[in-house]
Structure formats: C-alpha cells, structure tokens
C-alpha cells in the first residue's frame, strides 16, 4: 500500500480543526456530548457571573471568576479540537478519494456484447443493469461485473497500490470499481449500482460522515459517564447548603470549578475522537469499515477463520509429481492431467500443464482445434475437466472424484487411496485424475507455509483468540498443514454451507467470529460473521455481504484488522481508567481549598501544600483543561498495543494508566500552583 500517510499534526489540519472547534461551541453541537455539555453550561454561567461582577451587580472577584471561566471555555475548546482534528484527518482522506471521481462519458451498449452499437452518455446517467464498453485509457464509469473480455486495470487511485491487476469475465476476479483506469485491452461491464451508490461514494460517505453513529461500547460508556456526572452534580449541589449552614457559603464559581474537575471530562472530551481515529487508522491500513461498530467488533473477536491459501500458505501451489494408479502409465496420467487443465487459468492448473510439458514434452493443445468443452470448477462439484470426443476427463478432490467414479459405476482403487494418503501426510494436496469411471492417478500439489505465521498464531493464542484454518483440502493434508502452521483447529473439505454452519456454531457458543472472503460463494458466511472482511478484488456480492473491504485484497490483513480493533478498545479503556483515577488528585486540591474556611480539619487533605485556596482551585481547573491537549496524540494514535492475555493487559493498563492517572495530576497541579505563585497570579 503506497497511499501517503497523514502526519499526526498536519499544519493545514490544525488550522481547520481550530476553526471547527470554535464552530462546535454551539449548544446543539455540545448537547451530543453530555459530559462536555455540563462544562459548557458551567462556562456560560461563570461568564455571566464575571460580567455581573464587572458591572457591580453582584459582589465577588471578577478576576478570579473570569480566569476560571476562561479555562472552562478552554476545556470545551480543547475537547472540540480533539474531535475536530480526528474528523479533519478522516475528511482529508475522503478528499483524496474525491479526487478519484472524474466527470466522464461512457459507451453504453445496446446489447451485452462488445461489438454492439454504443451510445456516448455521461457516466452520471448510467443505471444499474446498463452495459458499458471500456477500452485502454478509459476510466471505468461505474461499479460492476465483467461479462466479457479481460484487461489490465490500474486501481492505485482506490488501493494506493501501483501494480496493475487483471480483471476478466467469470470467476472471482470479475468485479471492477468505478474510478479505476483500464491500461490495456477492453472490458464489457454490467453496472451493478446506481449513481451515488458506488463503492467510492460509500467510502467517501463513510469516511466523512459527520453524524457518526455511536458503537454499543461507546453508548455503554457514555451512559456510565452520564451517571457519574449526575452523581457529582447532585453531590456538588448539596455542598452549598452545607457550607452556608457552617457560616461560610462557597461561591457558585468554586462549586462549578469543583463539579468540572470531578466529572470525567478527560475521557468525555476524547471519547468521540478515539472512535473517529479508530476508523481513520483502519483506513490507513487500506481497510474500509462500513461503521465504527465493525471496528469495535474487530476488537472483541475471539475466533478467526483464515483461508489456508494466501493467508497461511504462500498460495502458489505447484504441481510436483504425477503418481499413476496401478496399471496406468505415468505419461498417460500426465497427458490426461494436462488436457483437464488446458483451460484452467489458476496457478495450480498452469503448473500441471507445465509439469507435463517438462516431464514428457507434452505440448499445450488448442481447445478449439480439439473441439473440446471445458468443465469449470465449482464450489459444489469441487472438480474441473474437459469433454473431448468420447473422453470425459476430470481432476479434483478425492471425495469429489470418488463420488463421480461411483456415480458412473466405477470403483475407487485401494492403491490410489494409499497414494492420496501418502501425499497428504507430507502436507501436499492430492488431486485425483479420472477418465470416465477409471481412476488414472494422483497429482501432488506442494504448498509452502508462510514464514513467521506460526509465531503470529502463538501471539493470537495468548490474547485468547482461536485460529481456525479453512481449506478445501482433505483432512490428512489439512491436518499436516495445520500442525505446521500452528493453528488451533481446521475445517477440511470446506464448502460454503460448512463455513456458514461453523460460524453459526461458534456464535451459538457466544463467540465473535471474523473471516475473509472474495467470492460470491463466500457471501452467506460473510453476512453471518461478526467481522467480515471482503477482498476488493472479489465479487460485488462478497463486498456487499461484508462489513469491511480490504483495498489491498490481502487475506492476511484480517489479523491486522483485529489488532486495530483491539487497540481502539484498549485506548478507550486506558483513557477512561486515567480519567477516573486523576479525579483523586483533584479532590485533594479543590476540597480543602473550598471548604477549609468552614471546616478547618480539611486542611489535612492539602497534601500538595498548595499556596492558597484560589491557586489550588485555579491549578486544578488549568490541569483539567491541559491534560486533554496532552492526551490528544494518544487518542489519535492509540495506546501501545502488545498481544497479551486479557488479565495481563488489565494489569498492565492499571499500572500504567491507573497509577499514572493518580500520580500525574499531583505533579501537574503542584507545578501549575508553583508557576502561578511565581508569576504573582495566586
């Protein structure tokens, strides 16, 4: 992925964020955040009190009240700035996507074939179901499926990846995205969406959406923060009659300052920024999440369903050997295997053709001159092949070929069963070749497990995440590769129905499941999974079923998605712990300052030795505002994440953010008090 990453504090974004922070001072904007709305209300109240004192309408220190009011406004502005900066980063990413959208004309065909008559129409007039022809140099005008042709496509505007990709009709690489460019050849595309509903439009709307829906965890945390705010509001309100009864009523300004310092303003001011930044980090990883809910679910995932090919193994299985059945010549097996693979454009199919050529000098033959019919592979049949003259040649998985042989009145030889088992035990994939009802032998396909993948799975296991390998291989091959890779479990001979059933089984146990997919046959399982990452190179059905799209089309990205989700949850939890813990230091600063005149015994709580009641209150309010600014980088970047168990992460966060939340305010408030005293402002 080569898309330029935004600096944490881009100057242009800072200026825009400052402007937006001021705009967010309106009551309507503040009402969306109940904790900060209380601070906003306190700011308005103390501002009115300051004006009343300046004009002589009420008695009191206009300077002290004015300074308190100023720092309360700063508290609100800093919280607004954090949210605006996070949103600004997302909007900047959205603007880069908007640059991809270009006004273009399209060749709308009157019939679904490339030589049909075409009309030039604006791309905005295209509707779902329209057929368009795009040629080399053209911008693809709409999202759709290739129904004819094949071409090299530059998708760098969407994915950031400069290497072109092949898009062709049939299979799982027929999906194209509007805004990408054709580099060579031509494609006939059936538009799959209406204007304004394209993948690019949805990406932009998701990234820059101002009305971001809160996630379930955010809602739960907001309810907790509101409850704490109400408790502290009631507690603060009851302190005035207590102090008045003692003969020295506390001023409204001090009570407002006390309330603002007691309520969890730190997490209240940063909560929205954390959520927006989480989605922004996901986009930085070239993954588009349809909502914050999907990012949050990624952090709670405890089961990963991982495709073997491309995720656990390198994905370029190569034919390594022909093992004939008893009584069959190896050359005859190689010839039949090559014929069955002539129209098979998969890496495995091409490698079979090449191996037969290398071993026996068998040259490729033209399908048309042979008057042959190719039988493509399907997830249901799990075999492919060719019909030529009176010959019916198939290659496929052991079970699929066994069913095929038995349905044609044949018998599956015991020696072939043994050869299949031997190949599988070595971790290779056996493909069986059959002609009619006669089994000819086995092709061995070697697969290589990715380096370092076993260690990554060990880290996931420490975090309490179960890894399950999904493969179409037989159980012996799957077991050998699973053991080598270090996964916890595997699903062999997987069909779409089996994947769906496995996901439902785990969900019935109360677990959250994540998976990747790219084909139409993956759509049901993607729709069922809690976190479903569809490949951008996959079909439209897969992308619509998933709640995330990986622009790099890298199945391994699922592990990174889980890491980002967990980092967002950890950031939220860590800053909540810090916010609640640092209230303790504020108690020791404000309560003695506010009530020592009425109850002298409270002077014992002034453990920081603050200079005066006014400096103590002002120091606490200033610290309360500044800590939001200091924590903005942490909220946007996320806390340092290490793959640990839940209990180990809890202990680590309590030590760092719990203890830190207790210690930092004591130091910060004391330093501010000393500075105020030195400057003569105490």
Swiss-Prot record:
Membrane-related topology note: Multi-pass membrane protein
Which residues bind ATP per the record?
A: 344, 348, 377-384, 395
User: What Enzyme Commission number(s) apply to this enzyme?
Assistant: 7.2.2.6
Q: Which GO terms describe its molecular function?
A: ATP binding; ATP hydrolysis activity; magnesium ion binding; P-type potassium transmembrane transporter activity
**What are the positions of the active site?**
307
Which catalysed reactions does the entry list for this protein? K(+)(out) + ATP + H2O = K(+)(in) + ADP + phosphate + H(+)
Q: Which PROSITE patterns match?
A: ATPASE_E1_E2
Which spans are transmembrane here?
Answer: 34-54, 58-78, 219-239, 254-274, 588-608, 616-636, 662-682
Keyword DNA-binding attributed = no
Q: Which residues bind Mg(2+)?
A: 518, 522
Which Pfam families does this one have? Answer: E1-E2_ATPase (PF00122), Hydrolase (PF00702)
Domain of life, per lineage: Bacteria
Q: Which UniProt keywords apply?
A: ATP-binding, Cell inner membrane, Cell membrane, Ion transport, Magnesium, Membrane, Metal-binding, Nucleotide-binding, Phosphoprotein, Potassium, Potassium transport, Translocase, Transmembrane, Transmembrane helix, Transport
Gene3D superfamilies found in the cross-reference section: Calcium-transporting ATPase, cytoplasmic domain N, Calcium-transporting ATPase, cytoplasmic transduction domain A, HAD superfamily/HAD-like
The record's subcellular locations are:
Cell inner membrane
Quote the CDD domains the UniProt record gives: P-type_ATPase_K
Statement: the UniProt record of this protein carries the keyword Magnesium: yes
A GO cellular component annotated for this chain's UniProt record is: plasma membrane
**What is annotated about its quaternary structure and interactions?**
The system is composed of three essential subunits: KdpA, KdpB and KdpC.
Q: Briefly state the protein's biological role.
A: Part of the high-affinity ATP-driven potassium transport (or Kdp) system, which catalyzes the hydrolysis of ATP coupled with the electrogenic transport of potassium into the cytoplasm. This subunit is responsible for energy coupling to the transport system and for the release of the potassium ions to the cytoplasm.
Task: Write the protein's name.
Answer: Potassium-transporting ATPase ATP-binding subunit
Source organism of the structure: Salmonella paratyphi A (strain AKU_12601)
């Amino acid at each position: 992925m080569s898309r330029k990453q935004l600096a944490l504090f881009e100057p242009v974004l800072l200026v825009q964020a400052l402007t937006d922070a001021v705009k967010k001072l309106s009551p309507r904007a503040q009402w969306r955040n109940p904790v900060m709305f209380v601070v906003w209300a306190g700011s308005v109240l103390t501002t009115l009190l300051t004006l009343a004192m300046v004009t002589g309408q009420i008695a009191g220190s206009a300077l002290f009240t004015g300074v308190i009011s100023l720092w309360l406004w700063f508290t609100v502005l800093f919280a607004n700035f954090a949210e605006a900066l996070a949103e600004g980063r997302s909007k900047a990413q959205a603007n880069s996507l908007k640059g991809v959208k270009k006004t273009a004309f399209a060749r709308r065909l009157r019939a679904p074939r490339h030589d049909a008559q075409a009309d030039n129409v604006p791309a905005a007039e295209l509707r779902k179901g329209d057929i368009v022809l795009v040629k080399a140099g053209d911008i693809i005008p709409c999202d759709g499926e290739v129904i004819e042709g094949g071409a090299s496509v530059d998708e760098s505007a969407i994915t950031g990846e400069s290497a072109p990709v092949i898009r062709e009709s049939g299979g799982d690489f027929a999906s194209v995205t509007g805004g990408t460019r054709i580099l060579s050849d031509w494609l006939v595309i059936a538009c799959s969406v209406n204007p304004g509903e394209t993948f690019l439009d949805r990406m932009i709307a998701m990234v820059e959406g101002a009305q971001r829906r809160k996630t379930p965890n955010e809602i739960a945390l907001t309810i907790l923060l509101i409850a704490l705010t109400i408790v502290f509001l009631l507690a603060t309100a009851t302190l005035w009659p207590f102090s008045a009864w003692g003969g020295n009523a506390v001023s409204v300004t001090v009570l407002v300052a006390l309330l603002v310092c007691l309520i969890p303003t730190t997490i209240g001011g940063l909560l929205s920024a954390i959520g927006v930044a989480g989605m922004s980090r996901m986009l930085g990883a070239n993954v588009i999440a349809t909502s914050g809910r999907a990012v949050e679910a990624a952090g709670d995932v405890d089961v990963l369903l991982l495709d073997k090919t491309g995720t656990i193994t390198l994905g370029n299985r190569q034919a390594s050997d022909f093992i004939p059945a008893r009584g069959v010549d190896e050359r005859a097996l190689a010839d039949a295997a090559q014929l069955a693979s002539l129209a098979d454009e998969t890496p495995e199919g091409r490698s079979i053709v090449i191996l037969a050529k290398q071993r026996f000098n068998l040259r490729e033959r033209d399908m048309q001159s042979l008057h042959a019919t190719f039988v493509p592979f399907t997830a249901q049949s799990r075999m492919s092949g060719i019909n030529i003259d009176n010959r019916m040649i198939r290659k496929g998985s052991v079970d699929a070929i066994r069913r095929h042989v038995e349905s044609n009145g044949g018998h599956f030889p015991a020696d072939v069963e043994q050869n299949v088992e031997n190949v599988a035990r070595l971790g290779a994939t056996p493909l069986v070749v059959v002609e009619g009802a006669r089994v000819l032998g086995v092709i061995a396909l070697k697969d290589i497990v990715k380096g370092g993948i076993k260690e990554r799975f060990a880290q996931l296991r420490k975090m309490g995440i179960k890894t399950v390998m999904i493969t179409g291989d037989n159980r012996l091959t799957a077991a050998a590769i699973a053991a080598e890779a270090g996964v916890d479990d595997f699903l062999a001979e997987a069909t779409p129905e089996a994947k769906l059933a496995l996901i439902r089984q785990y969900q019935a146990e109360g677990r959250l499941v994540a998976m990747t997919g790219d084909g139409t046959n993956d759509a049901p399982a993607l729709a069922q999974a809690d976190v479903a990452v569809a490949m951008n190179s996959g079909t439209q059905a897969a992308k619509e079923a998933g709640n995330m799209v990986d622009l790099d089309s890298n199945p391994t990205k699922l592990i990174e998605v889980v890491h980002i989700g967990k980092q967002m949850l950890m950031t939220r939890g860590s800053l909540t712990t810090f916010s609640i813990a640092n209230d303790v230091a504020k108690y020791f600063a404000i309560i003695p300052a506010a009530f020592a005149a009425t109850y002298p015994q409270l002077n014992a709580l002034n453990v920081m030795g603050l200079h005066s009641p006014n400096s103590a209150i002002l120091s606490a309010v200033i610290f309360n505002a500044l800590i939001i600014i200091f924590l903005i980088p942490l909220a946007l970047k996320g806390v340092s994440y290490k793959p640990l168990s839940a209990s180990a992460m809890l202990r680590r966060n309590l030590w760092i953010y719990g203890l830190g939340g207790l210690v930092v305010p004591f130091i910060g408030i004391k330093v501010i008090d000393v500075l105020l005293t030195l400057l003569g402002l105490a």
